[in-house]
Amino acid sequence: MEPAERAGVGEPPEPGGRPEPGPRGFVPQKEIVYNKLLPYAERLDAESDLQLAQIKCNLGRAVQLQELWPGGLFWTRKLSTYIRLYGRKFSKEDHVLFIKLLYELVSIPKLEISMMQGFARLLINLLKKKELLSRADLELPWRPLYDMVERILYSKTEHLGLNWFPNSVENILKTLVKSCRPYFPADATAEMLEEWRPLMCPFDVTMQKAITYFEIFLPTSLPPELHHKGFKLWFDELIGLWVSVQNLPQWEGQLVNLFARLATDNIGYIDWDPYVPKIFTRILRSLNLPVGSSQVLVPRFLTNAYDIGHAVIWITAMMGGPSKLVQKHLAGLFNSITSFYHPSNNGRWLNKLMKLLQRLPNSVVRRLHRERYKKPSWLTPVPDSHKLTDQDVTDFVQCIIQPVLLAMFSKTGSLEAAQALQNLALMRPELVIPPVLERTYPALETLTEPHQLTATLSCVIGVARSLVSGGRWFPEGPTHMLPLLMRALPGVDPNDFSKCMITFQFIATFSTLVPLVDCSSVLQERNDLTEVERELCSATAEFEDFVLQFMDRCFGLIESSTLEQTREETETEKMTHLESLVELGLSSTFSTILTQCSKEIFMVALQKVFNFSTSHIFETRVAGRMVADMCRAAVKCCPEESLKLFVPHCCSVITQLTMNDDVLNDEELDKELLWNLQLLSEITRVDGRKLLLYREQLVKILQRTLHLTCKQGYTLSCNLLHHLLRSTTLIYPTEYCSVPGGFDKPPSEYFPIKDWGKPGDLWNLGIQWHVPSSEEVSFAFYLLDSFLQPELVKLQHCGDGKLEMSRDDILQSLTIVHNCLIGSGNLLPPLKGEPVTNLVPSMVSLEETKLYTGLEYDLSRENHREVIATVIRKLLNHILDNSEDDTKSLFLIIKIIGDLLQFQGSHKHEFDSRWKSFNLVKKSMENRLHGKKQHIRALLIDRVMLQHELRTLTVEGCEYKKIHQDMIRDLLRLSTSSYSQVRNKAQQTFFAALGAYNFCCRDIIPLVLEFLRPDRQGVTQQQFKGALYCLLGNHSGVCLANLHDWDCIVQTWPAIVSSGLSQAMSLEKPSIVRLFDDLAEKIHRQYETIGLDFTIPKSCVEIAELLQQSKNPSINQILLSPEKIKEGIKRQQEKNADALRNYENLVDTLLDGVEQRNLPWKFEHIGIGLLSLLLRDDRVLPLRAIRFFVENLNHDAIVVRKMAISAVAGILKQLKRTHKKLTINPCEISGCPKPTQIIAGDRPDNHWLHYDSKTIPRTKKEWESSCFVEKTHWGYYTWPKNMVVYAGVEEQPKLGRSREDMTEAEQIIFDHFSDPKFVEQLITFLSLEDRKGKDKFNPRRFCLFKGIFRNFDDAFLPVLKPHLEHLVADSHESTQRCVAEIIAGLIRGSKHWTFEKVEKLWELLCPLLRTALSNITVETYNDWGACIATSCESRDPRKLHWLFELLLESPLSGEGGSFVDACRLYVLQGGLAQQEWRVPELLHRLLKYLEPKLTQVYKNVRERIGSVLTYIFMIDVSLPNTTPTISPHVPEFTARILEKLKPLMDVDEEIQNHVMEENGIGEEDERTQGIKLLKTILKWLMASAGRSFSTAVTEQLQLLPLFFKIAPVENDNSYDELKRDAKLCLSLMSQGLLYPHQVPLVLQVLKQTARSSSWHARYTVLTYLQTMVFYNLFIFLNNEDAVKDIRWLVISLLEDEQLEVREMAATTLSGLLQCNFLTMDSPMQIHFEQLCKTKLPKKRKRDPGSVGDTIPSAELVKRHAGVLGLGACVLSSPYDVPTWMPQLLMNLSAHLNDPQPIEMTVKKTLSNFRRTHHDNWQEHKQQFTDDQLLVLTDLLVSPCYYA
């Protein structure tokens, strides 16, 4: 790839590197380069300087005056726009000041969330290009961000509905942290570790939180001299943790993301080699591929896989370096998964595999770019020793190319493969392009497989640039271009849409890259050409032929679409969607081809298209559009030559056909006339200067045709007018050639072949701009005067009522007006007028700056825009008053109003779609390797044009003027008019206008709400609906009902509620009901808590002052006076007071609304819903609302009750009194010194946290002297720097208060809950069933009760007690659930009660719980489990000793049957699991209790015991730096179990399950006991397979031989439980992740079992092995002995006496060969061939009926083993034919006549070979000699094959 070897591409050639500060006094950080190429570039500096100065000054003042809104937001928005227009065009000093100011703003603690997001987005944008600011320039603290994340993402009040955050907030916050991370101070890492390490308790949710924090916060881009303060502090600790976790917990994936980032930022500074096998094994496991013969996936693995994107980044960063270990493993990874890419495979795992393929090359290219081409910046460069060498790149491309080529034809489409190939071809075109072409040529020939064509073409498009530019690695590339183009032509096929589109894209791509110039003459003139150049020269003679053939194809396409004449008659104006796509493809491809043609070829093409278009007459809808497009393309390329042909022709035809005046009034016009009008209107879309020659002719045509009666006719004529105006007044590039200056030079001076695939040069782009000349402008005004003026006069009179016009005439006039307006949009100055004042008071200027877009407005002429506005408004009122049903005119008026307001030469939606398509084309052809904007010239020109359009869209600013106000009001009137289509169109324009002007929504809301007022008479249903739609808004724009502003929602929300009383409201109409539903849903979805406090802290103000003082550029505005600043502060305090007043006011008005008599229930519910949004965490709800919600706990409607429950729970949280905390020193309590290094787990210094029945506090004194720690994770990993616990009872808020001691709000709640009637009613409602069988324990209700008991301690127990006793006794599902929710609330609410109160509480609860647990049923056990688990969550176990002792009394009493026992265990498990590591004593007691009961007969109890065991041993983890736990250990337990299972181990025959479920009492023998025990143990192993962190393999291995014996071989579900479980258990165990030191142990067991006398065991060893090896592939490959052992094991089992075992060994062997674990080497081949040659004993005639025949002879077994081995080798490469295969097949075929089972094996092998190789047989045939082919064909079709 030569171009990049030129130094410093992409920098203007300037001496001395960094540009000097110019006269402007500052060096911009990074401008948008495209601005320099605009035709008016020289005016931009002054413009941007002025804007920047205004932004700095006003943003600074706004902050200093404490005015966040509107001033602050207005000017930060202006700064965002500034960056979009000019890039980062400010000095480094200003850049830093902007960042610091926004950082301070974003981290204001009480900032309203929507403002926070606005500031955050801008800050992210300012920090985006991190190379612009080094760590020396900027330092940002990390704590404010942490406080924000903690407050928002881990909000304590959000779940109670006291805070409403938008969904986007999580991503914005994470991106913000990511952007600030490079600038955290050097000591940040240590501080973060100190802060979050204490959260690392692997059994607790806080672990997830800690790792999330590490992942998003830890800085990894520190310079090498600071590494000791960076990752070296945590790397060993976290990688150790990752390596030792065996089952994927959720946080493991986040660790991977962190390591990936660390690796990328520090290539060459970390030695990953020791971890590589583990990393690759885990990545392979995480793909969840189906392997092996009996597959059951661990359910855990499916959900928590790694994010492929991060895994790829990690792999890429580790590549290279001296050891090459990663490349070796990567090759191994692809070897083992390549066959999954074959198109015949499909499954849910395929997406991941495709993503891997697509991301890897992309990532490697990015790394190469960084190492070789990127401009060096302050970020640490990659050391030379670790840069990727050319060899590394070659190795990489070679290892990935096979799967990519397979993926080309994948079921999911070829997109990923094409993207991968694009990047691979940048690196190694010579390895990548030839195989792609090999697949492309046949695909272009095939007729039967069109999908192959689309797939290969899209891949060739990806590699097009690499192919065409050739370069020294792949010089022959360009020679393929012409053959490909010629062969692609048949793809232009009217019958196959997708083929047609991809062909267009293909041809367009290649034409853009190559000048289509015939250079064959150069061969005679020059003799210094290379071989390839000569070849290309002679080939280019075909270009002309290609262009002409392409045109013929297109004409064919067009003619076939004309056949659908029937559509002509119908009124469908539109083409179908597919037709319009084909039209687009055709026109853009044709225009690309002509742009790239030499003059000679162009002239031939022009003549051809002219002849075609003038010799036919086309219908104007489909075919006509396509032909006209082709003609337009031709005219655009060479206007002079083309206009000469077309204009006179069309004009003369049109003049002739309109000679007769009758034509003017015809309803239906002659086809020829229409076609010529269409053609003329399209070919005038060219360079305006060239049109001036023909102006007289064109004006004549307009005069003749603009007033045709036929709508189709005058519409085409209007198009002509529109295009003439646009062509003469707009600014646009006139050519998009791939080389500046075109190809029209003699071959002696210019050799086009040098320009094949050449990128455009940004610094010499040579854009030819069309800038309107004065002549063109005056022509445009002449057109407006001649054609627009008369229409306006007519319409003016019509609006005044002086002139009667028919509807058709009005429509015609409006059409002319609209076309004039959009034709001259950028000629007409924007609307002038008075601004609308007093909408929003502000102390800073909110002025807009006008942008210059290349034209000075001519203000001496009258402004047509204003005249149109006046006339149209008058006409509109006339039509609405007199003929509202003239909808067609109204549609046009709506369009005109929209364009008057917003159209300045380009439409926003067109701009957006062009920006999108620009990005798509850029992606499909970009060169990510060299970067530096090396795009092709046409793309660069397009990008400059987009920059110009962006400016025209922002030219106006957003000032809201009187004239805008009038027009928006007109739109509102139209939006509430009688016809739904008119309303719909008007509403869309209305929403667009609302989004365009500052603060206009506040002006318009009252007008919309007028239609909803209940007291207003005469509102029609249409107006009512229209107004509701106006409130609702569309999916993208503003929603008036929910502006985040008190002033607005104070009006809209109450209006929505009381509109229920309007007489226009009817709940019978489903459309209205749905509208209200949508409104309520949208408000709930979009509402974010609105701020009450807008104070700005001092730190912000200080930076704001600096910003105002910043020079270069600055406007010399004096600093603010102290009086002004005082006034600002005063206003700000008033604003806070206003906000509060508005808030209370809104609550009041809503309550008034909801409490109105005869308000329909729907509106009552909406009102209550809105009220519940107004709960906040910084302000208690007003008393009236509290009373309202409490009373509604007993409302009749369940919807209301549910809302009230949530609300009251929130209110109780607001009323919660704060509990005092104090700091303790844990080491003093334990009396142990602080551990010096990090040791997690049970240590002497955290022992005091454990539950210890000897020291639990049983008296008041003990209780009050204990130090309780409620949260479970403290102290496990390490102690926090500042450990706080709750202070003693006497310092806490007073309990047992009388009513007088309470606040008013509390009294309201107190009164209701002390009232027995109220409580009785409440309990009745709560114990009703909601949805049968669907109800669950409800956390909302639990929160309600927890709040009640926390805030009022035991005040309500007396009233509740009888209810609780009565509920517990009732065994109904809903009553049990109700009591469970209350009890959980009681236990958690009693956290701060005094000892006496708690003791009394447990006296009440214990009997209740005992009753409940003995009445437990299948419907309620889940609820009781949830109740106990919730009760124990985050509570100190020593405070709950009553509960634990109660639960442990006797879980398995047998009373109430096995089911109750199982449920009690479930409940107990819930409680203990919440306590994690702090109750070792209880776990030991439980284990001791359960061990004798492991032989339980009942299945449900066994399952439950298995699950409980998992939790008992959960704490026994082998994580690094963790002490052995005091809780029970697995090894000791397993040893005791093995002892009891001995009797089963020693027996050789099959173990039958002869234990009946309900067996007698008699004494059982050891085996029966053993089998029962085994069943429970299996349940335990299955339960822990996915849950525990690490598997204690060593001990469990000893159980394997037993399972091997039991597991059944056939897949049959009728087996008993024991066998099924054994099989499942083996499958789960085989997928487990092994540590390297466990490998020999496992193999030991497998080898031992392979000698077992049970063939079931030997068979199962093989299925186990398949999965185990694949799931631990690189761990095994890393251990040579292990590989030898496995090889020996499989090969020896091939000679097993049992046929099934032999066959399974063959399958296993073939699998191991296929994933490249073993290789087919000569010793193996020789071994099998020897075995095949084993002589078979002669057949003896035997007596009929003798037995001897059934046992196979040893010789037969050996011979069969050999044949199986060879068969395995054949089947191990299902998709290709390696060199050794033909001979093997011949050897196999020799055994076709051997005795069974050999013959069968050979047949099976051959039939499989045939099946897998059938698809690409043409390709595979090449590998065989002719003789071999004869034999093979014989075999594969011979009759014996079918026998």
Swiss-Prot record:
Disulfide topology: none
Disordered, as annotated region: 1-25
Keyword Nucleus: yes
HEAT repeat positions: 475-519, 998-1037, 1179-1217, 1354-1392, 1636-1674, 1680-1718
Subcellular location: Cytoplasm, Cytosol; Nucleus; Nucleus speckle
Modified residues (Phosphoserine): S1121, S1614, S1746
Entry keyword annotation includes Heme: no
CC terms in the record's Gene Ontology section: cytosol; nuclear speck; nucleoplasm; nucleus; spermatoproteasome complex
Domain notes: The bromodomain-like (BRDL) region specifically recognizes and binds acetylated histones.
Annotated family: Belongs to the BLM10 family.
This protein's name: Proteasome activator complex subunit 4
Gene that specifies this protein: PSME4
